[in-house]
């Protein structure tokens, strides 16, 4: 069987569609500065994300992490930002095995109340590239607030930063995690450096702000609640083979 080829015109059209989508989301919604809230209040923009790939035989593979809302201040939100690797299975497997494997992404406002929405992946960049995904909710909601962005060039080593999210090691010690705003954890530290991680194309802030599995995709905010980065990874100590105290967040300019 001859493989179906995509013409150069089709490729250009698809590329322009993606560029147009990103510009539409962030040109209108990705507002810089003006957070006007403390880091604790920024929890009101954070969500828990559950991603799964499955087939009709009951087999599945799941991932989870954190996301956060973007939009115009004071208006309902419809877009969520997270890491690409948080939703990778739900996006990539259906692409590789159409009509055999299906994907689902759920955005939770409160798992305890079974309050969630099915989201559509409208932009996806894999872990080896930008490692960013944009999710679109079925309709605008007031259950979360939009977080403002801070230009990356204004962030300097020594700046205070706070990581928000749902780290698995913290949730595992709770008898009944709710995955709501009250379950969002906060860790504090400083920006150490700006670098590029091996095997990726994005720039990241190196930091001593503690993050763990489950924090992926969550916002790294400043003392005014502005998002400086997207929490993404922790370095391994090559001597011990254990996780180190060196952590990374994708700079927010990679999003805009």
Question: Where are the regions that the model predicts?
Answer:
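N-terminal Sec-pathway targeting helices
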Residues: 3-20
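A short, Trp-centered hydrophobic/proline-enriched beta-strand micro-motif
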Residues: 41-58, 66, 161
């Amino acid at each position: 069987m001859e493989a179906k080829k995509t013409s150069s015109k089709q490729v250009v059209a698809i590329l322009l569609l993606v560029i147009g989508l990103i510009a539409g989301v962030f040109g209108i919604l990705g507002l810089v500065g003006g957070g006007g809230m403390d880091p604790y209040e920024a929890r009101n923009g954070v969500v828990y994300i559950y991603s799964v790939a499955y087939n009709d035989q009951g087999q599945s593979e799941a991932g989870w992490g954190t996301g956060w809302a973007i939009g115009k201040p004071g208006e309902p939100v419809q877009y969520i930002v997270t890491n690409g690797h948080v939703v990778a299975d739900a996006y990539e497997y259906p692409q590789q095995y159409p009509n055999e494997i299906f994907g689902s992404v759920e955005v939770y406002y409160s798992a305890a109340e079974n309050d969630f929405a099915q989201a559509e992946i409208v932009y996806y960049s894999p872990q080896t590239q930008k490692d960013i995904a944009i999710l679109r909710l079925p309709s605008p909601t007031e259950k979360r607030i939009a977080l403002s962005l801070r230009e990356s060039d204004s962030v300097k080593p020594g700046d205070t930063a706070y990581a928000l999210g749902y780290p698995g090691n913290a949730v595992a010690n709770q008898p009944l995690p709710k995955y709501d705003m009250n379950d969002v954890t906060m860790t504090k530290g400083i920006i150490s450096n700006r670098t590029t991680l091996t095997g990726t194309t994005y720039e990241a802030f190196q930091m001593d702000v503690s993050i763990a599995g489950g924090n992926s995709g969550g916002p790294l905010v400043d003392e005014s609640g502005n998002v400086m980065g997207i929490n993404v990874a922790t370095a391994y100590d090559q001597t011990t083979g254990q996780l180190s105290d060196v952590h990374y967040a994708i700079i927010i300019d990679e999003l805009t």
